[in-house]
Amino acid sequence: MRSNILKLLQRTSRRYVSSKDFEPVIGSNPKKQTSRLMVGSVGVMIPVLLYLFYKNDSKHSEIKKIYQNEKKI
């Protein structure tokens, strides 16, 4: 991080400072950013879908009923 700032200052000291010099380096490539968003959304959706399928599964509801009946006794 510090070396990036030093390089930036060395680069900008020779000429007029423009707003492009202070743009973030990470995420500047739109294709990379889109692929990261896709991977992130898939990484979040898979566990959520697995949880929903498990929760709505008939075996899970039977186990839940048995557990609730035992809890009442």
Curated annotation (Swiss-Prot):
The keyword Transmembrane helix applies. Keywords: Endoplasmic reticulum, Membrane, Transmembrane, Transmembrane helix. It is found in: Endoplasmic reticulum; Membrane. It is a single-pass membrane protein. The keyword Endoplasmic reticulum applies. Its main location: endoplasmic reticulum. GO terms for cellular component: endoplasmic reticulum; membrane. The chain crosses the membrane at residues 37-54. It holds the Pfam family YKL065W-A. This is Uncharacterized protein YKL065W-A. It comes from Saccharomyces cerevisiae (strain ATCC 204508 / S288c). The lineage of its organism: Eukaryota, Fungi, Dikarya, Ascomycota, Saccharomycotina.
